[in-house]
Amino acid sequence: MAIHLYKTSTPSTRNGAVDSQAKSTPQKQKSLIYGQHHCGKGRNARGVITTGHRGGGHKRLYRKINFRRNEKDISGRIVTIEYDPNRNAYICLIHYGDGEKRYILHPRGARIGDTIVSGTEVPISMGNALPLTDMSLGTAIHNIEITLGKGGQLARAAGTVAKLIAKEGKSATLRLPSGEVRLVSKNCSATVGQVGNVGVNQKSLGRAGSKCWLGKRPVVRGVVMNPVDHPHGGGEGRAPIGRKRPTTPWGYPALGRRSRKRNKYSDSFILRRRK
């Protein structure tokens, strides 16, 4: 990923850094695009804010991504590499030999004109999708299935990559990008390689307005709120939070407290927790 730094001509662009990687800008594939009605903006069915700092943002069209890679043994050609406003990874349009067209996540290093294929007896090369049982140990993978046939659910963000470290019995052992080591069925499929747009964390929006375009509203500290709005609020001047430990706006412990449900069914598949 190529990062372009703005010239310091205005205060808003002085600290900006944007992605300048070459992407094709074709007409969108209309059969794979549809609109979504976003009216919640972080609210639940009662209109109560359950996820903060969401709202506004530019209007988007959703691109239907093929996470299942279910065109078995049919080779496809990468026609475009496109920006997707709904995720931080790029997507690429694939034209398959039977006439089908699909969007998939862009693997790192893939270029327009490259050929990919999915199936059981396909080469272990970048962009190909195949079951874990047919992969060799140490293979870098992404878009990994947890449930057979449901489609990839793990390692889908920009720059993420997992590693196949063991195969025993009916399960395969994976090291995920978070550092977690877990078991997955060997029959689940995954895509070889790393997700593209690796340097996404080097981008700097430079100003608050660019953040608002993404649908992210300002973050306000609880200590500067009123007592009715946050447990940390109130007091005269710069007052401390008045508690032994920080809490969420609803009074639950924050900053370090594990929020994962105890005795969850998938605990038996996790060999080592994430870092």
Curated annotation (Swiss-Prot):
GO cellular component: chloroplast; mitochondrial large ribosomal subunit
InterPro entries xref list: NA-bd_OB-fold (IPR012340), Rib_uL2_dom2 (IPR014722), Ribosomal_uL2 (IPR002171), Ribosomal_uL2_bac/org-type (IPR005880), Ribosomal_uL2_C (IPR022669), Ribosomal_uL2_CS (IPR022671), Ribosomal_uL2_dom3 (IPR014726), Ribosomal_uL2_RNA-bd_dom (IPR022666)
SMART domains: Ribosomal_L2, Ribosomal_L2_C
Gene Ontology BP annotations: mitochondrial translation
PROSITE patterns for this protein: RIBOSOMAL_L2 (PS00467)
Ribosomal protein keyword on record: yes
Chain residue ranges for the region called Disordered: 1-30, 225-275
Main location: plastid
Keyword terms, alphabetized: Chloroplast, Plastid, Ribonucleoprotein, Ribosomal protein
Compositionally biased region (Polar residues): 21-30
Subcellular location: Plastid, Chloroplast
PANTHER family: LARGE RIBOSOMAL SUBUNIT PROTEIN UL2M (PTHR13691:SF5), RIBOSOMAL PROTEIN L2 (PTHR13691)
Similarity section: Belongs to the universal ribosomal protein uL2 family.
Name by which UniProt lists this protein: Large ribosomal subunit protein uL2c
